[in-house]
């Protein structure tokens, strides 16, 4: 019975999605043609005026964020599934360069239990999808950093940990220090501090997961 009822439920969901799209289009058209709603007259009750104010200040989703067809709806759900798998299995590549690496080791210890977020540290860049640059990046180390980054499979992300990795830190004016690892590799998350605590790096990992959750790569590819 469940197998027979599944197609019916799917059709009801798709029809509900279509009606929601039609309603949103009508709301956008009415707002564009009629303009902002006039202020309520004094004769209206307080309840009606409150409802009209709430309707005027309501946030309507943009049409560009909604699926335009059944195929795009399927692509959107597939995008959500892929993003869930990626953010739930982040494998960082350890690239400790200075004292920030000690706090990175602290975060990887059993106290914070990073396994519950799917974070597993790998020693090989070919098995990692996240690079944590922890410490001062010198000019001699910059080519090695770029080479390791190029060996990581797509999609890959970079977390810049500490003031030295973010912008040079104490050694900003040194002749032998790169003033920010974002001059060598693209950075997704910046973790401030000198050195940042293990909790700060943990918060940066959580922010990276939120960023991955918002990605819409398949949807952008499909709309091309």
Curated annotation (Swiss-Prot):
Chemical reaction(s) catalysed: a ubiquinone + NADH + 5 H(+)(in) = a ubiquinol + NAD(+) + 4 H(+)(out)
Keyword flag Ubl conjugation: no
Region feature Disordered, mapped onto this chain: 28-50
Binding of [4Fe-4S] cluster, residues: 99-100, 164, 194
Molecular-function GO term, any one: monooxygenase activity
Covalent S-S links between cysteines: none
Cofactor binding note of this UniProt entry: Binds 1 [4Fe-4S] cluster.
Record GO biological process: aerobic respiration; mitochondrial electron transport, NADH to ubiquinone; mitochondrial respiratory chain complex I assembly; proton motive force-driven mitochondrial ATP synthesis
Subunit structure: Core subunit of respiratory chain NADH dehydrogenase (Complex I) which is composed of 45 different subunits. This is a component of the iron-sulfur (IP) fragment of the enzyme.
Name of this chain's protein: NADH dehydrogenase [ubiquinone] iron-sulfur protein 7, mitochondrial
Organism of this sequence: Mus musculus (Mouse)
Protein's gene: Ndufs7
